[in-house]
Regions:
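Conserved beta-loop-beta/alpha segment of the NTase-like Rossmann-fold superfamily
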Residues: 81-149, 153
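Short, structured coil segments at secondary-structure junctions
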Residues: 67-70, 151, 171
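Glycine-rich phosphate-binding loop of ATP-grasp-fold ATP-dependent ligases
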Residues: 18, 141-143, 186
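Short aromatic/basic micro-patch
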Residues: 24, 112, 146, 188-189
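Conserved beta-strand scaffold positions in the cores of enzyme catalytic domains, especially
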Residues: 22, 74, 132-134, 175-179, ...
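N-terminal glycine-rich phosphate-binding loop and ensuing alpha1 helix
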Residues: 2-55
Length: 205
């Protein structure tokens, strides 16, 4: 199965007060924590491709060496400032060019998600040939999420700031759950007070 690991690094960070993806955390930018783990994961699986979609030229510049080394690909999406649907559409169009059978969407503002958890999620979805899937913790669904090829067209039809959760809800009976016990792993950074490395012992690789 050809899988595109789709990394959303294009948010506007309105509630954070500045670009949260570039904010320093434990020695590197927020967006690099999970990205570096996903790059390792993709490198261990022959048919998995890592694709970063961003509206930020600085992120493109910083990732250029990894692109040159063949560790990931990038897509510039300036329209992402209008909403997450534009980021998703740009990523899906790139995934289709890669002839992907499925894509997994990861958010760049989840720096605490462990490498082991991310890889187990991907392997579980691939092994089950999941039509749709997402993580669950405490009865709540969240990112990352999984979409097989039959749902790509619906993802491209999203508008404004509507994300993939709308597609999941529409086909809830087809969603395969992946349980995560540690809620802090799924914590996303909307505000500076959400920074919680001190509570988790650091952003371990």
């Amino acid at each position: 199965m050809r899988v595109t690991i789709f990394y959303l690094a294009a948010g506007n960070s309105r509630r954070f007060g500045e670009n949260k993806l570039l904010y320093p955390l434990d020695g590197k930018a927020v967006y690099r924590h999970l990205l570096d783990r996903l790059a390792k994961i993709a490198g261990r699986h022959e048919n998995w491709e890592l694709l970063v979609v961003t509206q930020y030229e600085r992120i493109l510049e910083e990732l250029a060496p990894l692109v040159k080394a063949g560790r990931l690909q990038t897509v510039f999406s300036p329209d992402s400032e209008k909403g997450i649907s534009y980021t998703i559409r740009a990523g899906i169009e790139a995934a289709e060019k890669q002839n992907a059978d499925a894509c997994a969407c990861f958010a760049a503002d989840q720096p605490y998600l462990k490498e082991e958890t991310a890889e187990r999620f991907l392997e579980s979805m691939e092994m089950q040939k999941a039509p749709l899937g997402c993580v669950f913790c405490g009865g709540e669904s969240g990112n990352p999420a999984w979409f097989s090829k039959p749902y790509f067209s619906e993802l491209k039809e999203l508008s404004g700031d509507r994300g993939g959760k709308k597609v999941l809800k529409r086909h809830w009976e087809s969603v395969i759950p992946f349980l995560v016990e540690a809620a802090w792993e799924l914590k996303d950074l909307d505000r500076k007070e959400d920074l919680c490395c001190r509570d988790t012992g650091g952003c371990h690789e």
